[in-house]
Design a protein with these regions (language model features):
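A short beta-strand-loop structural module common to alpha/beta enzyme folds
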Residues: 46-57
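Short, Lys/Arg-enriched N-terminal segments with co-localized hydrophobic residues
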Residues: 5-18
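Helix-adjacent hinge/juxtasegments
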Residues: 63-103
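Alpha-helical segments flanking ligand/cofactor-binding loops in enzyme cores
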Residues: 38, 65, 69, 91, ...
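C-terminal binding/interaction regions
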Residues: 22-24, 28-29, 107-169
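Glycine-rich phosphate/diphosphate-binding loop of Rossmann-like nucleotide-binding domains
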Residues: 22-42
Length: 169
């Protein structure tokens, strides 16, 4: 679960603790990654850049795994992973135990991924969303809080499946 670092929905908590956010991307998302890094740094977050900075073709699973491992290990509080559609990089991130990566192409889904699924990695596609939409998605995702309650039970069930599949039960 994410520490109490996320701003309240009512516009924000001025005493908010800033976070360390891992970001990874493939060659399709270099420009968008830099836009998101700038946004995160403007908001006072520390950014761990685990993506490529060149547009030379590369393999998105490498970067999804890097972001997932940074989050799962506690090296980062949250992660953002960007490829062409957000789909492939999310599949790779979700292979890391403890990661709940969600693909979000608009703010509502981003908010709900945090509120109901306690998503710890946000994924989206550089070929799907423009820079302004991407910034809105990131801001809304960071501002949302996990609601717990019945949603905690459901997240626990998801994590139970993961433990079984990893041979821990």
């Amino acid at each position: 679960m994410i520490p109490e670092k996320i701003r309240a929905e009512d516009g924000g908590d001025p005493e908010r603790t800033e976070m360390k956010i891992a970001i990874g991307n493939d060659h399709t998302a270099v420009e968008l990654k830099h836009i998101i890094v700038d946004l995160l740094e403007e908001k006072g977050h520390t950014v761990l850049n685990l993506g490529t900075d060149t547009e030379e073709s590369c393999d998105y699973p490498v970067y999804g795994e890097r972001v997932g491992r940074a989050v799962a290990s506690g090296q980062a509080d949250l992660g953002i992973a960007i490829c062409g559609t957000g789909l492939g990089i999310s599949l790779a991130a979700n292979k890391v135990q403890g990661v709940r990566a969600c693909v979000c192409s608009e703010p509502y889904t981003a908010v709900m991924s945090r509120r109901h699924n306690d998503a710890n990695v946000l994924c989206f596609g550089a070929r799907v969303v423009g820079s302004e939409m991407a910034k809105m998605i990131v801001e809304q995702w960071l501002d949302a809080e996990f609601e717990g309650g019945r949603h905690q039970r459901r997240v626990d069930l998801i994590m139970e499946i993961e433990r079984r599949e990893c041979g821990e039960e």
